[in-house]
């Protein structure tokens, strides 16, 4: 990790050189092979530019911008600087967590930190860019109700979803729905009365991330998945996620403010480890347990914001 930060050029050269760096990490060249394969999932296992662009740059940029606006509203000086620094620190921790066995710097880490993470912070500090994504593309980040297990400290029900509701010309009651993460869902959003939106998408997600211990090259196994979301004016009320991913067959989240003013709940079903249930509160820690051989008490990682009903 330190080599990637302090010796980025050397890390790129050790990972195959500049050609591999541009071809696999930045440019969407793999899309051509995917199309030629008639959209075979196996040909999409190394399109690292996709999570780099949507996850690191756009999602990271939106997160930084939102944090900056929150800090600014609270009168914190140098809000953009603090928000950008916090976002980059989180990106470094994420790289350390996802690459625990690597002993040398990699071109992938260099790309994510210096090109996409930093680029997203800078890009979304521009008001015109932030306004375009918020008001034209209707981009938002919807998160699961992340929880910590006690006493193991395991992180459970943790996921961020970058979603878009893209306008359809001459259609006022529906939009094109796009959910991006490591995988992707494409579908439609139906605009209901009272500011409610119902979004349905289908696509694929990653079952397992494979990292070459020498080069740091990342590939993934792709599995089918689908999702359903209910929100009101962008505030997520409930979500349902189904997939063939072993560790996340079914996930249900009902957020605080949907059925109860302060409490929310979630359910996670896995292929081999039974299921887990959790309870959250918008302003205080809660707990949960599951009647299975792998049941543990769960505590929300942070208070959930109140959903606007």
What are these regions (language model features)?
Residues 58-74, 114-130, 286-290:
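Membrane-interfacial alpha-helical segments at the cytosolic side of multi-pass membrane proteins
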Residues 72-82, 126-143, 258-259, 290-294, ...:
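Short loop/turn motifs that connect adjacent beta-strands in outer-membrane beta-barrel proteins
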Residues 90-114:
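Interfacial helix-loop-helix junctions of multi-pass membrane proteins
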Residues 109-159:
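Extended amphipathic alpha-helical segments with heptad-repeat/coiled-coil character used for oligomerization
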Residues 167-254:
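Long, repeat-rich segments with strong aromatic
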Residues 271-309:
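Outer-membrane beta-barrel "beta-signal"
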